[in-house]
Design a protein with these regions (language model features):
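Glycan-recognition patch characteristic of GH18 chitinases/ENGases
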Residues: 54-57, 62, 73-79, 83-86, ...
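Bacterial Sec-dependent N-terminal signal peptides
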Residues: 1-29
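Membrane-proximal, proline-rich intrinsically disordered regions
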Residues: 20-72, 108, 116, 122-125, ...
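Amphipathic alpha-helical surface "interface" segments used
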Residues: 71-72, 137, 204-218, 338-348, ...
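Structured, solvent-exposed acidic/aromatic patches
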Residues: 34-41, 80-141, 145-423, 427, ...
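C-terminal functional modules
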Residues: 420-533
Length: 533
């Protein structure tokens, strides 16, 4: 230490009597080891993993476990929970991590990475004029991510979001109106989808793109399909906007088969924290261990109007349900796989409530149907958006006379068929043949068994199994299926199903802009801008 004391005065004298110009002083502040050029291919792949809640920000289970599963799957009554795990959507309780996870991970993960790609491919960036397809694919990913944020929270920072990365030191972005964000996102989808072209140089895009492997035609279909989703989501509050963009989506070309589904592949390696399916990890015994019991609402729907026969059963019953079974880290042990005996757990109940309903001490594992474990392997793919949704939205648009869509019955039947036949990506044994779908459609004729819009809403709801975030949004907008709310003593909503997430406490306390532009009141029953049902 004494040498430092002696050296310091000498250094100070040297600085005082040394002539330095401003440029030399400026250079002293530049870190010669700082990274100022990055391989955008790696960043793009990370952004794609991020939309599957599997990006670079930490636990790949975190957002799925707390929000997709804990809130959404239970609130829309696909799953039920009578103790254990994370399930604020079952009894309408509060979990601060459930509220925070999508906000924090979306901004800090995929949107951060996408912002870097857009910055470096814009004028002045080191890849300016290059990677045009990657740039426009990133705009589509960005629209997907912001749509989800708006649908969860309402108003969010958008136009000035993620600008802390561009050197502007813009650390407290304003909140923007949801309607303005939606309009800009639709414009972005329109421009980005149209601009993608197979004739442009690849420059590593195909290798970086793990969703479509650089297939520009599929990217364009996904962009226009997202446009259709967002336009229909705005249809009750801005008819002109919906009409314009449904028409553009149809003209641009939406998904036409399950081969167009947007799917992020997963893998077992290099570790459980990297590349594995976060939904599966949340449920897998010995890892997440979240209970996997299916809701009575869902099982009753899949068993058809007559529970005493399989004649009108939905062919997805024993695809979504693996049966009544015991699942441990060591083995999946079926107890009862008879379709007639499948039984869902009622939502909003505790163990003592189940005992009272059943008239005996209930062993949950031996009583209630579980999610099929074949859909919950750690390397199972993660489906982001499916073709079935597109056909069902086109059926709704045709039924309501929006955007020039026509032939609602054909679109509905194509949507149901696609929804029944998309699960073989998890395991070949989950394939549903055409005969089974034909029988189901014949037993449930479009617009006859129930009103057409109700049938469309119910099919959208069941088609989003595992993609519970979007099922929650569909239910909030359409109002089908008719769900009976729970009213548990610990609930915070007065017996109302939650209709939005609350902002993270860190955002409330840390961003001064929250006070002037956020959606208020900041509670679970405030409706986002498109929710009129």
């Amino acid at each position: 230490m004494k040498y430092l004391y002696k050296l310091f005065p000498a250094l100070m004298l040297g600085l005082l009597f040394t002539s330095c110009d401003s440029e030399e002083l400026h250079d002293l502040n530049i870190n010669p080891q700082a990274v100022n050029e990055m391989n955008l291919n790696f960043i793009f792949t990370t952004a794609e993993l991020g939309i599957a809640a599997n990006g670079s920000s930490g636990d790949n289970r975190y957002t799925d476990w707390r929000t997709n599963i804990g809130m959404c799957a239970h609130a829309i009554q696909h799953l039920a929970n009578a103790g254990g795990g994370i399930a604020p959507g079952d009894k309408y309780t509060e979990n601060f991590e459930t509220n925070a996870a999508p906000f924090e991970f979306t901004y800090n993960d995929q949107l951060k990475n996408i912002a870097e790609i857009l910055k470096q491919t814009a004028d002045g960036g080191y890849d300016a004029g290059n990677k045009a397809n990657m740039r426009n694919a990133s705009r589509i990913l960005r629209a997907f991510s912001f749509q989800r944020l708006v649908d969860f929270y309402g108003n969010v920072p958008y136009f000035n979001a993620n600008r802390g990365l561009d050197g502007s030191e813009y650390f407290f972005p304003e909140y923007d109106e949801s309607s303005a964000i939606y309009k800009d996102l639709l414009k972005e989808l329109d421009e980005a989808s149209a601009a993608m072209s197979a004739s442009l140089p690849d420059e590593g895009f195909a290798a970086a793109d793990i969703i479509f492997n650089g297939d520009v035609a599929k990217w364009k279909k996904w962009g226009y399909s997202l446009m259709l989703r967002m336009a229909m989501r705005a249809s009750d509050v801005d008819a002109a906007l919906a009409n314009t963009y449904v028409q553009k989506a149809i003209a641009g070309g939406v998904m036409t088969s399950n081969a167009d589904n947007a799917i992020v592949p997963m893998a077992l390696g290099p570790s459980e924290w990297t590349n594995q399916n976060g939904i599966s990890r949340a449920f897998f015994p010995g890892d997440g261990g979240q209970p996997t019991f299916l809701s009575k609402t869902l099982i009753d729907y899949l068993k058809g109007a007559d529970h005493a026969t399989v004649a009108d059963d939905d062919p997805r019953l024993m695809v979504i349900s693996g049966g009544i079974a015991d699942w441990t880290a060591a083995a999946w042990t079926p107890i009862n796989t008879n379709p007639l005996d499948q039984k869902g757990m009622p939502n909003g109940k505790d163990q003592q409530d189940l005992d009272a309903i059943e008239g005996t001490a209930v062993d949950q594992a031996k009583t209630y149907s579980r999610i099929n474990y074949l859909m919950l392997q750690d390397d199972d793919p993660y489906m982001i958006m499916n073709y079935a949704e597109v056909e069902l939205l086109l059926a709704e648009a045709a039924e309501r006379g929006i955007g020039g869509a026509s032939n609602a019955k054909s679109h509905f039947e194509a949507g149901v068929r696609a929804a029944c036949q998309m699960y073989n990506i998890y395991d070949a044994s989950l394939k549903v043949d055409n005969a089974a779908v034909d029988a189901y459609l014949a037993a449930n004729p479009y617009g006859t068994a129930k009103p057409a819009l109700q049938m469309i809403g119910e099919q959208l709801w069941v088609s989003k199994f595992l993609n519970w975030w979007e099922a929650w949004s569909d239910w909030r907008r359409i109002g089908y299926p008719v769900l009976v709310p729970t009213n548990h003593p610990s609930g915070l909503t007065g017996g109302k199903i939650p209709t939005r997430l609350k902002y993270p406490t860190s955002e409330v306390a840390g961003n001064p802009s929250y006070k002037s532009g956020s959606t208020q009141p900041d509670d679970y029953t405030t409706r986002v801008w498109w929710d009129t049902k």
